[in-house]
Amino acid sequence: MTKSNTINRIGTPLSATATKVMLLGSGELGKEVIISLQRLGVEVIAVDRYSNAPGHQVAHRSYVIDMTDEVALAELINQEKPDLIVPEIEAIATAKLVELENAGTIRVIPTARAAWLTMDREGIRRLAAEELGCATSPYRFADNLKELQAGCAEIGFPCIVKPVMSSSGKGQSKLSSSADVAAAWDCAAAGGRVDSGRVIVEGFIDFEYEITLLTVRAIGADGEVHTHFCEPIGHVQVNGDYVESWQPQRMHPGALQKAHEIAKRVTDNLGGLGLFGVELFVKDDMVWFSEVSPRPHDTGMVTMASQEQSEFELHAKAILGLPVNVALSTPAASAVIYGRHDGKVVSFEGVAEALHIPGTDIRLFGKPESFARRRMGVALAKAADVDTARKNAKAAAAKVNPVVSS
């Protein structure tokens, strides 16, 4: 890809010259991408499956559709005729995007093929392990309980079972013995994004820590695509759901080099422009590929405090063919603010108290409904070192209380 494939000029929103970007998925990550695009004069259309999603609140126009419905998706694309389509979630009719991109009628970020491959864990795992030769955990796929029982027996215990399509740890189980298999199947069926009924069984890796390596493919001054790496982000997940993250994560130089090599191998194959969140397991100088998202990553919200340009700014600039800057400005951390109760009229207490903690900031996502363990916001903290930043971010998050009135 060269400059001839990118946007050559940026127009004026809501005019005949407008540069139009359509986001498919408008949650908290999409909201920040929209804000970054609007700062660059882009007209943004936000699409999601429910009304008043976070990204809907800041876009020029918004729509509510079933994004897995090929007909509805194609009709909306034809109606709006965006210059770029930016998938922000996995549950999209990606086969239709591939068809439309191959026909030359749309351009998908980073590519329609990348969106299709990463829409579920099977496509990207087979690409990384079987085609690209990346080290991964051992794995099997299963379509029913009997196949799952056989797969778990082959992999051995402990193991992890996940739906091939889910997010934020939904439907994920850690199995200690064969007695856990049936419950894991039911959990995966309940937690999957779509009713595919297919799961992945992963062998347990004895890793020391896990990272997200934000990897950016952007056009350089020479007109060619260059790969940039942000400083590694350490994070803690509970049942597959991001709880806190920090940047930078210290790594053995050999491990960092391997992480760069794996991330570049995978993102080069996926192609296109934009930011990718590459998840990796690390122990000493050993690195295993886990997953990749061709879009900003939830653990990367820390970059709103830690970097010269956040992951959202990087994504927006890269997809528009603009230069990027991945420099770290300060150690920082993020901690999730969770919903505590179920309800649809949501407000927040304790924000002022949280912001009295040195170096902190708060982002409230504006989700119209709260429920227990739903991500409702994030606390950010800058400090001279990561340990202090983590302590302050967690303390700030703990002070913010989402309350519901109904």
UniProtKB/Swiss-Prot annotation:
It comes from the Bacteria. Gene3D superfamilies: 3.40.50.20, ATP-grasp fold, A domain, ATP-grasp fold, B domain. Residues 126-320 form the ATP-grasp domain. One of its GO terms (biological process) is 'de novo' IMP biosynthetic process. ATP binds at R121, K162, S167, S168, G169, K170, G171, Q172, E202, G203, F204, I205, E210. Pathway: Purine metabolism; IMP biosynthesis via de novo pathway; N(2)-formyl-N(1)-(5-phospho-D-ribosyl)glycinamide from N(1)-(5-phospho-D-ribosyl)glycinamide (formate route): step 1/1. GO terms for molecular function: ATP binding; magnesium ion binding; phosphoribosylglycinamide formyltransferase 2 activity; phosphoribosylglycinamide formyltransferase activity. InterPro entries: ATP-grasp, ATP-grasp_carboxylate-amine, ATP_grasp_subdomain_1, PreATP-grasp_dom_sf, PurT, PurT/PurK_preATP-grasp, PurT_C, Rudment_hybrid_motif. The keyword Phosphoprotein does not apply. Its EC number is 6.3.1.21. It catalyses: N(1)-(5-phospho-beta-D-ribosyl)glycinamide + formate + ATP = N(2)-formyl-N(1)-(5-phospho-beta-D-ribosyl)glycinamide + ADP + phosphate + H(+). It is an enzyme of class 6 (ligase). One of its GO terms (cellular component) is cytosol. N(1)-(5-phospho-beta-D-ribosyl)glycinamide binds at E28, L29, E88, D298, K367, R374, R375. Mg(2+) binds at E279, E291. Keywords: ATP-binding, Ligase, Magnesium, Metal-binding, Nucleotide-binding, Purine biosynthesis. Homodimer. Belongs to the PurK/PurT family. Involved in the de novo purine biosynthesis. Catalyzes the transfer of formate to 5-phospho-ribosyl-glycinamide (GAR), producing 5-phospho-ribosyl-N-formylglycinamide (FGAR). Formate is provided by PurU via hydrolysis of 10-formyl-tetrahydrofolate. HAMAP family: PurT. This is Formate-dependent phosphoribosylglycinamide formyltransferase. It comes from Janthinobacterium sp. (strain Marseille) (Minibacterium massiliensis).
